[in-house]
Design a protein with these regions (language model features):
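Internal alpha-helical scaffold of NAD(P)-dependent oxidoreductase catalytic cores
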Residues: 103-113, 129-165, 178-215, 260
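NAD(P)-dependent Rossmann-like dehydrogenase/reductase catalytic/cofactor-binding core
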Residues: 203-264
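Small-residue helix-packing motif on alpha-helices
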Residues: 32, 59, 75, 194-201, ...
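Short pre-catalytic strand/loop immediately N-terminal to key active-site residues, enriched for Gly-Thr
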Residues: 5, 114, 163-168, 220-225
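Rossmann-like NAD(P)(H) cofactor-binding subdomain of soluble oxidoreductases
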Residues: 39, 45-48, 56-132
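Short acidic capping loops at alpha-helix termini that bridge into adjacent secondary structure
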Residues: 28-31, 88-90, 196
Length: 264
């Protein structure tokens, strides 16, 4: 039997993680416990064999891995409530936005493996980009946590000092990509497509472009060169976008988001 996993917080993120663990067969239903105050909303998970409870302490006692998936303002209260049930044999993973590892340590006061993981909303369809950092974790534990989050998408290990930047590029980045797709759809409608067809073409084109980079490991400019011809329509469109500040506005937006999160 694998490690028992307690997901503290049965909101959208917590339930998405549970679903990913099940669909990938990383964990059996009997190895997952998920907690929430209102457990009636977790009926579908219960029907799949996952244990649901409103008792955080009971879940932690039964588990080897604890995934903290609560709201940021709840972290201190929840950690204070479960810290007596944590020990050096357990793994604590926070998927809460913000909150440094040393802040968790100061509350828990246990010599154990600590992790922060930053998934994005595509975790709901097992296509997240998750950035992970850790402290006091051995290589085997780091591999285990990476494998766990690989069930819901791609994983990269980073230094904790880059977690805010990861939030911008991976989490906020979803919104940036959606805004590009929305503009693409609007342009498609203007040149003749109905909204439904334009949406499909725009979304699939972006998905295909991303897969080219992921599967081939090529640079974006290499793929751009393949669809641009002298005096062609692609280069005319790209040049007009750049004249209007396409790349610079995106870069400035990313930096503005980072300055905001760093300031707060």
């Amino acid at each position: 039997m694998g490690k028992r996993i307690a997901i503290i917080g049965g909101g959208n993120l917590g339930t998405a993680i549970a679903e990913g663990l099940l669909k990938s067969k990383f964990s059996k239903a009997a190895e997952i416990i998920i907690t929430k105050r209102n457990i009636s909303t977790l009926k579908s998970l219960k029907e799949k064999g996952i244990e649901i409870t409103d008792n955080n302490n009971d879940a932690v006692k039964k588990s080897n891995v604890i995934i903290l998936a609560v709201k940021p303002f709840q972290v201190e209260e929840v950690l204070n409530g479960i810290k007596k049930d944590l020990n050096t044999e357990k793994i604590l993973i926070s998927v809460v936005t913000g909150g440094l590892i040393n802040e968790m340590e100061e509350i828990v006061k246990k010599n154990m493996a600590y992790f922060r993981a930053m998934p994005n909303t595509a975790i709901a369809i097992q296509q997240s980009m998750t950035c992970i950092c850790s402290k006091d974790a051995d290589p085997a534990t780091i591999k285990y946590v990476n494998d766990l989050f690989s069930t819901v998408g791609k994983v990269v290990t980073i230094d904790e000092k880059l977690m805010e930047a990861a939030t911008i590029l991976a989490a906020c980045g979803t919104a940036y990509a959606m805004r590009y797709i929305r503009a693409n759809i609007q342009g498609g409608i203007e040149i003749g497509f109905d909204a439904s067809t334009a949406s499909l073409i725009a979304a699939q084109t972006v998905k295909g472009a991303a897969e080219l980079l992921l599967q081939k490991g090529s640079h974006p400019e290499q793929e751009i060169d393949k669809v641009t011809t002298p005096k062609g329509c692609t280069i005319a469109g790209l040049n007009e976008m750049e004249h209007q500040g396409f790349s610079s506005s995106l870069i400035r937006g990313i930096v503005a988001s980072y300055k905001k999160i760093a300031k707060d």
